[in-house]
Amino acid sequence: MEQPWPPPGPWSFPRTGGETEEESDLDVSPSSSHYSPVPDGGAQMYSHGIELACQRQKEFVKSSVACKWNLAEAQQKLGSLALHNSESLDQEHAKAQTAVSELRQREEEWRQKEEALVQRERTCLWNVDAISKDVFNKSFINQDKRKTEDEDKSQSFMQKYEQKIRHFGMLSRWDDSQRFLSDHPYLVCEETAKYLILWCFHLEAEQKGALMEQIAHQAVVMQFIMEMAKNCNVDPRGCFRLFFQKAKAEEEGYFEAFKNELEAFKARVRLYAQSQSFAPVTVENHAPHSGVGCIGSAEPLPQNPDSLQCCPPAPLCSVDSVVHKEDDDRMMDTV
């Protein structure tokens, strides 16, 4: 049977048997009074554009984290060698210094790329015509089979474990996060990081800055764990405890790299949300959730905030099933 295009994303996951969610005032599902459909073509084009932007952001976070983590590793190694005064270590010390210099150069290159990305987003708001051309020039018939299968697996994973991922995103303490991942090690994967990153965009579009910062913290945590596993050439599920050990000890280099990447990521999310493409949408212009990154219409914002209707449906933006409202202040602690 033919699958719909684009495939459903985490913002439109169907509830399985017996699973219920309290109706939220942000509910824009077809059964809601706020629902007002628009032509499928426009929704698909816009969803595709948002997905491209979010994917670009995820790749940037991944590369930036890799650079910062490798630099922290090299600095720690250099520091440990400095404690020894043996001449036999001179050669290794020189190699470590060279590695630090190279990594600092790479870090500077990524800093320049980040500045270029920020400048481009400030000067180039969403171009619907460009999105349209990209969509209609792309062949959906001859897609690479492996890529399609990977996307299907990713969507299936996020659909199956959506509630668990959201729960992890709301945790605010290192010990709580480590304990939760110990109980649910299958969540230590790229799909969890992707879901949390996309959630950050939606929360910032809703002007829920404090909650966005909490979810951003957990998104960067997951990305750092994945990078550590890559560097150690081990399964991420087997090394996440090492990350929390370093984080709780606030080891020099590692913790600083984490904080810097977290602040940089939050700044990029805010910048994206300020563009028309990630603005909250009016009820009249709201589009059905046809893709992972669909946030809504690219129409200019009205001046009256009462007329705005934010896009994420109740299953995503309603967190009362995970944490009670009176715990909001506690949840905002990021350490």
UniProtKB/Swiss-Prot annotation:
Entry-linked PANTHER family: CDC37-RELATED, HSP90 CO-CHAPERONE CDC37-LIKE 1
InterPro entries found in the cross-reference section: Cdc37 (IPR004918), Cdc37_Hsp90-bd (IPR013874), Cdc37_Hsp90-bd_sf (IPR038189)
Complex formation: Self-associates. Forms complexes with Hsp70 and Hsp90. Interacts with CDC37, FKBP4, PPID and STIP1.
Region (Disordered): 1-42
Biased composition (Low complexity): 27-40
Bias (Pro residues) ranges: 1-11
Record region (Self-association and interaction with Hsp90): 147-276
Entry's Gene Ontology cellular component terms: cytoplasm
Major site of localization recorded for this protein: cytoplasm
Name of the featured protein: Hsp90 co-chaperone Cdc37-like 1
Region of interest called Self-association, as start-end residue ranges on this chain: 2-170
Chain segments carrying region Required for interaction with STIP1: 277-335
A molecular-function term among this protein's GO annotations: protein-folding chaperone binding
GO BP annotation list: protein folding; protein stabilization
Matching Gene3D superfamilies: Cdc37, Hsp90 binding domain
Chain coiled-coil ranges: 84-120
Keyword terms: Chaperone, Coiled coil, Cytoplasm, Phosphoprotein
Gene: Cdc37l1
Record function comment: Co-chaperone that binds to numerous proteins and promotes their interaction with Hsp70 and Hsp90.
Taxonomy, superkingdom: Eukaryota
Location(s), subcellular: Cytoplasm
Family: Belongs to the CDC37 family.
Modified residues (Phosphoserine): S32, S88
Residue segments, region Interaction with Hsp70: 266-335
